[in-house]
Amino acid sequence: MNTQVINQVKQYVTQRAIFIVLILLVIGIAIADPNFLAFSTLRDILQQSSTRAIIALGAAFILVTGGVDLSAGRVVGLTAVVSASMLQIDEYANRFFPDLPHLWVGFPIIIGIVAGLIVGLVNGIIVAKLHVPPFIATLGTMVAVYGLNSIYFDTEPNQSQPIGGLRSDFTVIGSGYIDLGGGYSIPYIVLIAIAVALICWVVFNKTRLGKNMYAIGGNIQAAHVSGIHVARNLIALYAIAGALYGLGGVLEAARTGGATNNYGNMYELDAIAACVVGGVSTAGGIGTVPGVMAGVLIFGVINYGLTFIGVSPYWQLIIKGLIIVAAVAFDIRKYMAKK
């Protein structure tokens, strides 16, 4: 009986480990500085984590299939630049397009999302039709997209000046909020991230595409045998991921009020790390939307919280690296135990 209880406790802790870690992180930082629990601090963490969450959700679609997408960060940079270049105020001295008429704010946003979707389609076709390993395929598109973005931006790599002077009807999406009264508010960008997460949850759990995604990641040969059109599903999943990266890039430009062709650098690694820490298996076939969101929040708490209490950025990198290694090791251990 005692053994059964112990096993049940172990299973409970294992299944909820990511949320336990998040709670412990918040408690630990709050002990070091009680001001960390102020509502404004938690709101800032959520606001800064929102775009990362959308990008991580895109990466999760690919990881669950057993693949990996290294192009995410550069797609974010491309879509941030494209949308920002079309949404500068008319009076700004250094307008990217001096003669561009005043556009409806939604048009460049749609253009950015579609640009991301197109890159995702290209990734999907290369992986599904040409049978190039996802790591190599997306590494190639990562470099190509950065080159394309630099050509569009018309500058040498690593020598860019930000596109500034963005219109307020665009930046309000990233920095505006709904006032709840009493000193409380919810940023628009947080609500957008929650809406995207809910849609992704539906796709993961309530659609044929989601079921096929798990089947492909669990055993691609078995998926073929069971009649799943693997290539078609992979292309669709990569396209969805690209669209999410595109949305993330647009929102990041709105949040920060500018963009350069170096935007999004290393975002793909942060997204993959958040997914893995959130329980998405590197072997494929396993992963949940709540887990991904928790993984993003863990890194949000680490980035903001450790800076809040004065921890060196270099120590923050070490801590993040150790968390990633521990998460992957734990994932591999579970995978080997099942085998």
Named regions from a protein language model:
Residues 1-56, 91-107:
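Membrane-interfacial amphipathic/re-entrant helices at transmembrane-helix boundaries
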Residues 238-239, 245-246, 255-321:
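Transmembrane alpha-helical segments in multi-pass inner-membrane proteins
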Residues 1-25, 225-232, 302-339:
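Cytosolic-side transmembrane-helix boundaries in multi-pass membrane proteins
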Residues 104-112, 118-123, 181-259:
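Helix-loop-helix "hairpin" substructures at the membrane interface of multi-pass membrane proteins
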Residues 28-32, 37-91, 125-131, 279-289, ...:
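Single transmembrane alpha-helix segments in multi-pass membrane proteins
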Residues 91-142, 294:
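Alpha-helical transmembrane segments within multi-pass membrane transporters and channels
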Residues 6-10, 63-68, 118-165, 203-208, ...:
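Short loop segments and helix-boundary regions at transmembrane helix junctions
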Residues 135-206, 233-236, 256-264:
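Transmembrane helix-bundle core of multi-pass membrane transporters
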